Amino acid sequence: MVSSTSELITQPVNREEVVPSRKRIKLPAWLEVVKPRLIPLLLATTVGGMALSEEWPLPSPRLACTLGGGALAAAAAGALNCLWEQDLDKRMKRTSNRALPSGRLSQSSVFIGAVACTLVSSALLVSGVNCLAAGLTLLGLCSYVLLYTAFLKPRTSQNIVFGGVAGAIPPLVGASAAAGHIGLGGWWLFSLVMVWTPAHFWALAILLKEDYRSVGIPMLPTVSGPFVTAKAISVYGYLTVFLSFLGCFVLPEGGLLYGILLLPYNSRLLQLVSRLRDNPEDLDRAKGLFRWSILYMFGVCFLLVISRLQVSIVFNDQLIALIKDFSIGFS
């Protein structure tokens, strides 16, 4: 009985079981290769970077050019990633039916599409935003395709720790789009995404470790096992919580309100991290942490924007005044 239970807990799952929308929505081949499900979170952290600037909110045309250019660059990065990894995808049952391995799209059409997206993205950002935002966006694209996909991913179990820089660049793009420079707030959100990424991705890697093992990709769960991975996730989870609260001090306004609203997000994150550390072989716990980690980062960016609303700023100032009056009463 114990043996059968263990097999049930550790049985590998498909990505479709982790992200239920994959079951319901069959994407066209041309849309599948650009990995559209990854783009919304990248745009959310871009907006988060904007909200940390004194110049928030941005004029609508500049906001549209920033998000449009970012989405196109992310699409190009996704397509180039699919091109690079098509041989690996052929060898994994989970990915063998993707557009390139199955022959539904040709390599040349995907490459041309990626180049077109990159050129239009750069044109939008240079003409509608600024050269710094355009340069950072191009840096993010190159770091994802060259640094992470081509160099780090097949060589080291710490690939996502260093390769995570690609996913952390959008806050820098947002900050530079708003102010023309990055600033302390942009660097803070960049750092937060960097430390959040390993905990987020390794939870997924636990679920898909057999896929990675079958093609020789040295993800941490395949190299060191789920127990070591769960401990590493715990370290990065606590770092994420610590860094997230520093946002109280880098927000131009509304920092106290942001910190208060962040409490339940961090409490839930630590709860799920602890549950996985207690039983790293329970795939339901890894799945729960992976899903929550996505909502967590969306939530942080949402709170950054909410904290910059005028009504939030007024409420934040009233809270500070109340705390001061309360402290004076005890002095």
From Swiss-Prot:
Cellular component terms per the entry's GO annotation: plasma membrane
Highest taxon of the lineage: Bacteria
Cysteine pairs bridged by disulfides in the record: none
Annotated TM spans: 63-83, 109-129, 132-152, 160-180, 188-208, 215-235, 241-261, 294-314
Alphabetized Pfam families for the sequence: UbiA
Protein family membership: Belongs to the UbiA prenyltransferase family. Protoheme IX farnesyltransferase subfamily.
Official protein name in the record: Protoheme IX farnesyltransferase
